[in-house]
Structures are given as structure tokens and as C-alpha cells.
Amino acid sequence: MFRRKLTALDYHNPAGFNCKDETEFRNFIVWLEDQKIRHYKIEDRGNLRNIHSSDWPKFFEKYLRDVNCPFKIQDRQEAIDWLLGLAVRLEYGDNAEKYKDLVPDNSKTADNATKNAEPLINLDVNNPDFKAGVMALANLLQIQRHDDYLVMLKAIRILVQERLTQDAVAKANQTKEGLPVALDKHILGFDTGDAVLNEAAQILRLLHIEELRELQTKINEAIVAVQAIIADPKTDHRLGKVGR
């Protein structure tokens, strides 16, 4: 399950690593922090290194929080995969000069392009790498957790396309130029006895109407986005049909 990343990190036994073995798991976490992640100072790693302590799970849980891991101690496989991903990124950062000039093989590039044509179809939704990545993005973007990771991925894609692309950001930053409004054409319906107050009340009413229209637009967009997710057979297996 973790063989590729363990191999990339030069772990001594990538093929035989057993995360369910408590002693092996704790020793692995110590190795990962000491050799690859190095989040703590050397003098602060004592609690984590004390693998025989009954309080070790508490120290490990704190460690997960300190490195901003989105998973809890109960999600052992996901947490391990996330920590391995962090270690790989740090390893690359430490050796950027070594890897920056590597050129991918042309045949592999062509194969990858074909596979990526339909990314949602080719994804292995049971892969821990996929689950960990989707969960990390969902936590970062504050998207509610869903049992179907593919549904969460599509929600992430919609949010990124609508809010975080260059065009979306530029559009959000544009200053809206309003049109002049003739207040005398909008009947207030009551009289305060003061012309200035009447005019202020008319302005407030028009602003409130504009806010309601914007709210309705956002509600409609949200409904369409939800329908696009739940009505897609690729993300809702209940809608998938074979034959008639």
C-alpha cells in the first residue's frame, strides 16, 4: 500500500512494512520524524521516541496536530499515507537541484495524457493516496465531508472553478458600476413627514431588494451545483444502469 513512497524515501523494508504491528508502526513514525520530516527539534523528540510508553498514542496525536495532518490517530492508514506524502515533498525540497532537470519519457507522457482524458473514470477511489488527497483538499477548502470521496472531489472542482481560478478572482475583484435610479419613480408606501428621511428609506429599500436578488442568485447556483453532483452516474453509483 505504501511501497512506492517508502521506496522513494529509502525505507529499509518497503515491501514488508506492516502498519498494524504496533511496535513496527511506532518505530516507523520515529524514523520518519528523525530522518525525513524533522518537524521537532532533536531535544523535543523524546516523547515520540519513547515507543514503549503508555502515553505514546497521546504524543503521536499531538504530533499529527503539530504537522497539520488532517487525519486523526484512529485513521492510521490515511495518517501514514499523509505523513509519507509530506516526507516525499520535503525530501524533494531538500534535493530540488538533483531532480529539477529530469525529463519525463515521451511514451509515458503520451500514455498519461490518454489516461487523464477522463480523470474521474480512471481514478481508483479505494486508493489511500486518493482518499488522503481529497480529504486534505476538503479540509483546506472547508468542504463538508461525504462518504463518497468522488462526490467530495467533484465539489472541490466546482469550488475551484467558480471561486479560485484567475478569471473567477478577477471577476470578483471587479468594481460594479451601478446605473442611476430615479427615486421618485419608486413609491415608498408610507410618509415619514420628512423629505430627507423618505429619500433615505427609498434608498434602503432598493439596496435590500438588490441584496435579496443576489441571495436568490447564489441559492440558484448552489441548487444547480448540488444537482450536478447527485445526478451524475459517475459520482452516484445508484444512478448507474446497464441496459434498459
Swiss-Prot record:
- Molecular function terms in GO for this entry? identical protein binding; RNA binding; RNA polymerase II complex binding
Carrying N6-acetyllysine, the residues are 20, 62, 98
Q: Which GO terms describe its biological process?
A: negative regulation of protein kinase activity; positive regulation of transcription by RNA polymerase II; RNA transport; tRNA splicing, via endonucleolytic cleavage and ligation
Tell me the compartments it is located in: Nucleus; Cytoplasm, Cytosol; Cytoplasm, Perinuclear region; Cytoplasm, Cytoskeleton, Microtubule organizing center, Centrosome
Q: What is its main location?
A: nucleus
Write out the tissue specificity statement of the associated record: Widely expressed. Expressed at high level in heart and skeletal muscle. Expressed at intermediate level in liver, pancreas, fetal brain and fetal lung. Weakly expressed in adult brain, adult lung, placenta, fetal liver and fetal kidney. Overexpressed in many brain tumors.
Give the CC-aspect GO terms.
centrosome; cytoplasm; cytosol; mitotic spindle; nucleoplasm; nucleus; perinuclear region of cytoplasm; tRNA-splicing ligase complex
Cited InterPro entries: RTRAF (IPR019265)
The induction text for this entry reads: (Microbial infection) Up-regulated specifically following influenza A virus (IAV) infection in a viral replication-dependent manner (at protein level).
Q: Which UniProt keywords apply?
A: Acetylation, Cytoplasm, Cytoskeleton, Host-virus interaction, Nucleus, RNA-binding, Transcription, Transcription regulation
Q: Which residues form a coiled coil?
A: none
* Protein family: Belongs to the RTRAF family.
Job of this protein = RNA-binding protein involved in modulation of mRNA transcription by Polymerase II. Component of the tRNA-splicing ligase complex and is required for tRNA ligation. May be required for RNA transport.
Subunit comment: Homodimer. Interacts with FAM98A (via N- and C-terminus). Interacts with NIN; which may prevent phosphorylation of NIN. Interacts with POLR2A. Component of a tRNA-splicing ligase complex with FAM98B, DDX1 and RTCB. (Microbial infection) Interacts with influenza A virus (IAV) RNA polymerase subunits PA, PB1 and PB2, and nucleocapsid NP. Associates with IAV polymerase complexes both in the nucleus and cytosol. Associates with IAV ribonucleoproteins (vRNP) packaged in virions. Interacts with hepatitis C virus core protein p19.
Q: What is this protein called?
A: RNA transcription, translation and transport factor protein
| Native source organism of the sequence | Homo sapiens
